[in-house]
């Protein structure tokens, strides 16, 4: 079976149909799927955030990505991204490491753009060589020199593995896993649990409800969506 088609089938199997739900922050997941939820909170000073565990080779993540960006920009809330490269995918780990290179060594905004472009061109990247060629073209287009060795000391790979470890502690089992989180410790799962829906469009009403629910909190500063490093 074609690897790309097989990956799409797996992603489809992991995405459960959307079940109608009220737009509200429910608190701890009722199905008990998620374990250590202590990290499900916005960055300091923010009332609400979108938390995403993603795999750059995941077709469902590629479909959700522009919706995440649109929702975050519309409501002026940050996106906190965790890399969760699935072992069945050929090049997703290397792509995550290079995104970290851009974030840490070049420009976080360029790292965001790299992730967006990888998702947009995902269907044409079938191997590590394809990813290397895509990345070289991306760097040239943005006036950057391609490093001879991206991660000589393994620090960036360690950051990606640390993100993956956070996902394991939370009990992430599929990608994308998406939450809307509040600064009062409440959250709602948009995608990724065992029993709920998987429609990223739910981000809009849930973020709206979360902002109303936290309206008495200190106002959040309006800012652009930024990539966040987790160690």
Predicted regions and their residues:
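Sec/Tat signal peptide C-region and signal peptidase I cleavage site
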Residues: 18-23
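C-terminal cap of thioredoxin/glutaredoxin-like
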Residues: 5, 136-231
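A short beta-strand-turn-helix
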Residues: 30-48
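N-terminal export leaders
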Residues: 1-10
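Extracellular/periplasmic catalytic domains that process cell-envelope and extracellular macromolecules
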Residues: 42-45, 72-74, 91, 169-174
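Structural alpha/beta surface segment adjacent to cysteine/selenocysteine redox centers
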Residues: 51, 56, 62-138
């Amino acid at each position: 079976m074609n690897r790309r088609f097989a990956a799409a089938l797996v992603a489809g199997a992991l995405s459960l149909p959307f079940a109608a739900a009220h737009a509200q922050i429910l608190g701890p997941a009722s199905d008990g799927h998620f374990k250590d939820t202590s990290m499900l909170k916005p960055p300091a000073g923010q009332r609400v955030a979108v938390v995403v565990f993603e795999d750059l080779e995941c077709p469902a993540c590629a479909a959700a990505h522009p919706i995440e960006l649109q929702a975050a920009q519309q409501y002026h809330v940050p996106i906190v991204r965790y890399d969760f490269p699935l072992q069945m995918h050929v090049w997703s780990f290397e792509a995550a490491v290079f995104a970290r290179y851009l974030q840490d060594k070049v420009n976080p905004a360029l790292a965001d753009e790299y992730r967006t472009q990888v998702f947009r061109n995902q269907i044409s990247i079938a191997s590590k060589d394809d990813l290397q060629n895509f990345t070289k073209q991306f760097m040239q287009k943005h006036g950057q020199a391609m490093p001879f060795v991206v991660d000589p000391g393994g620090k960036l790979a360690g950051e990606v593995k640390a993100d993956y470890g956070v996902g394991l502690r939370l009990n992430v089992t599929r990608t994308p896993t998406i939450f809307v989180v509040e600064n009062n410790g409440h959250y709602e799962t948009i995608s990724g649990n065992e029993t709920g829906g998987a429609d990223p469009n739910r981000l809009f009403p849930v973020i709206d409800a979360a902002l109303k629910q936290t309206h008495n909190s200190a106002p959040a500063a309006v800012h652009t969506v930024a990539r966040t490093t987790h160690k």
